């Protein structure tokens, strides 16, 4: 999942989307 899709990808997981080196991370 790219940075632009990260917020949508993490949505509903009570997570804070962050992006490191182009990699999406959903930090719960």
UniProtKB/Swiss-Prot annotation:
SUPFAM superfamilies in alphabetical order: Scorpion toxin-like (SSF57095)
GO cellular component: a single term: extracellular region
Keywords associated with the record: Amidation, Calcium-activated potassium channel impairing toxin, Disulfide bond, Ion channel impairing toxin, Neurotoxin, Potassium channel impairing toxin, Secreted, Toxin, Voltage-gated potassium channel impairing toxin
Top-level taxonomic group: Eukaryota
One GO MF term: toxin activity
Tissues of expression: Expressed by the venom gland.
Disulphide-bridged cysteine pairs: 3-19, 6-24, 10-26
InterPro entries: Scorpion_toxin-like_sf, Toxin_alpha-KTx_8/9
Gene Ontology process terms (BP): negative regulation of potassium ion transport
Modification type Valine amide: residues: 28
Coiled-coil annotated residue ranges, if any: none
Protein's UniProt keywords contain Transmembrane: no
Subcellular location field: Secreted
Family: Belongs to the short scorpion toxin superfamily. Potassium channel inhibitor family. Alpha-KTx 09 subfamily.
UniProt domain comment: Has the structural arrangement of an alpha-helix connected to a beta-sheet by disulfide bonds (CSalpha/beta).
Function: Blocks voltage-gated potassium channels Kv1.1/KCNA1 (IC(50)=145 nM), Kv1.2/KCNA2 (IC(50)=2.5 nM), and Kv1.3/KCNA3 (IC(50)=15). Also inhibits calcium-activated potassium channels (KCa/KCNN).
The protein's name: Potassium channel toxin alpha-KTx 9.5
Organism name: Buthus occitanus tunetanus
């Amino acid at each position: 999942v790219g940075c632009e899709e990260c917020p949508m990808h993490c949505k509903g997981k009570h997570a804070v989307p962050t992006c490191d080196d182009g990699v999406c991370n959903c930090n719960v």
